[in-house]
From Swiss-Prot:
Residues 356-394 have a biased composition (Low complexity). Its EC number is 2.7.11.7. Residues 124-328 form the Alpha-type protein kinase domain. The keyword Ribosomal protein does not apply. Disulfide bonds: none annotated. GO terms for molecular function: ATP binding; identical protein binding; myosin heavy chain kinase activity; myosin II binding; protein serine/threonine kinase activity. WD repeats lie at residues 458-486, 500-528, 540-568, 580-608, 620-648, 660-688, 700-730. Residues 395-404 have a biased composition (Basic and acidic residues). ATP binds at residues 298-303. This is Myosin heavy chain kinase B. InterPro entries: a-kinase_dom (IPR004166), Alpha-type_PK (IPR051852), G-protein_beta_WD-40_rep (IPR020472), Kinase-like_dom_sf (IPR011009), WD40/YVTN_repeat-like_dom_sf (IPR015943), WD40_repeat_CS (IPR019775), WD40_repeat_dom_sf (IPR036322), WD40_rpt (IPR001680). It comes from Dictyostelium discoideum (Social amoeba). The lineage of its organism: Eukaryota, Amoebozoa, Evosea, Eumycetozoa, Dictyostelia.
Amino acid sequence: MIFKVWFSYEDEEVELSELTNDTTVSAIRKILHEGKIFRFPYGTSQTDLQIGKMLPSGSGGGATADSKFEKFKARNTLADIQYKVGDTLYVRVKKSKPTNDSLLPTLNIAFLDGSERAIKWEYDPYTTTAQWTCTATLVKVEPVPFAEGAFRKAYHTLDLSKSGASGRYVSKIGKKPTPRPSYFEDVKMQMIAKKWADKYNSFKPPKKIEFLQSCVLEFVDRTSSDLICGAEPYVEGQYRKYNNNSGFVSNDERNTPQSFSHFTYEHSNHQLLIIDIQGVGDHYTDPQIHTYDGVGFGIGNLGQKGFEKFLDTHKCNAICQYLNLQSINPKSEKSDCGTVPRPDLIFPDTSERDNNNNNNNNNNNNNNNNNNNSNNNNNNNSSISKSLVEISSGSKERNDRDSPSRQLFVSNDGNTLNTNKERSKSKSIDLEKPEILINNKKKESINLETIKLIETIKGYHVTSHLCICDNLLFTGCSDNSIRVYDYKSQNMECVQTLKGHEGPVESICYNDQYLFSGSSDHSIKVWDLKKLRCIFTLEGHDKPVHTVLLNDKYLFSGSSDKTIKVWDLKTLECKYTLESHARAVKTLCISGQYLFSGSNDKTIKVWDLKTFRCNYTLKGHTKWVTTICILGTNLYSGSYDKTIRVWNLKSLECSATLRGHDRWVEHMVICDKLLFTASDDNTIKIWDLETLRCNTTLEGHNATVQCLAVWEDKKCVISCSHDQSIRVWGWN
């Protein structure tokens, strides 16, 4: 039987519905406390609440001031107390025990300057009925953040109810308005992870781990913004991300967090997975929980998709073996220990999580930007893109005359090829390179025997994109900035840092006036190339922007929202939205009147820029297509299936498949009939496009090589990696 019950607290009365005879007093206390039904004193916990009835002192009926309160036991049900529909139950708050004032410390009033009242909500995962409790406290939050990520800012905070170092906290406040339940969900996840860490430690691994005791702070006296935040103890040291979209920051401590994720998967009977491990040393924070059914734990819970991504990328290490965990995705002995997760795990994408995060870092499309804007400076051949394909802001006549790619879809009779007709089945490889150099100056060939590492630039944040513009190198970083380097006297010097994005910068391109940057914050920023300042922001994508690309009329952008947007360079308005891909668009490339797009749906689509329609789809890769580039009548595509495919653009057939990398192919660039490929196996391979053989392998990075750029004037190739370094490889 379901019925309603009236409850009275002081001068307030409320009605709770859908209660039954089996409802316990403990359950009612939880409803009243968590639902904030009454305005209880600050600091009132669930166990402080008492439910009972009033026993009249005299012969008259009803409750009076002299009535006696009779408390029910927590385990009593409504049937036990013989509740009758229509009766009123009374709520009281247990009085605290009197204190001896002589034992209280002297209050330093000056210490309270700048302090504010707050309610601290804590979640206890260890009780059989895991529950929230709250206490009143006094805190002092610094007005200026000391650090920030893609979605939150971090503030030094003092909990004045604690003494010494134990009162030092970090408050994390969202940059944008965040629903109140999200903060509670994050704390709940971290405390559940803390419980799993204790179970992991009980198996006596080489290193014990700890998830910080987190809480939710609700500020009592604030009325405008930032009414709530997450908080956790402050830990001194360097903050690192071990297990997210930015890859590994360090090889020193990566085995432990990866084995912990594996441990949670196996010991939950494949029903739960704790991922996104990060923190200081072995003190972890901000995890994400995936569940098999995808229920609970916020939009970051990818369910079985999250499991699949982990299973596809995890490489068991010595600790996994020590803990007798079942082997996942066995690799060769040459494989490094640890896990290199898919780049798009950090991003907040409910359908694919193609980025954040953010935090989250996945910029596999970067080769396209090396092919941009080659016609801006006819006398300058400094960028590798300027020696490949005429795709940018030069005159239409020059594009028509010089660009060989305008003939890619032209039949022998001069008419546009109808891709629906029967195509040639020829598998021949056309490697003859047309004369498409910007000037007539003869290029010097690259002597592979002389290539060596000449400089290493180390930084705190991961660099995920490189773009060369004249004498400057622009780098997109995971700390939401663009760093500008000048190459002087064989040394790279950071001369400026551009800030404005609220998420990692994933792609950059430029023309003679502007620099364009795409970010996981879903926006594209337009920067004045001379003054290096942001002058406009393009908004339209619903999810992270992974790739941006230019021609003389339009800016093209690909996103996790599965679309390609076409922006008019004169008005900076979105003119077209191209929809055909089934998953995130990761890479773009232009040749003549055709746009090529690679996607996580494993395909490459060919778009006619006259009609803005998809003419054809190239299929062959078995996993995500991460990078594409064009030379002559061949298109080259790299994929997470570890291969590079060569497509003949006359027959639209795959003419060859290059194998050699042990892990994903992240990025490619072409220079002097050589194909440079960056991979998740930490190496750079150089392929001869005449023989289609790998001639050289460059080793030196300690983690995924994310992006490459060739600087021909400087006779070097530049690489950036998840190991937080930029390396310069030069030749004679």
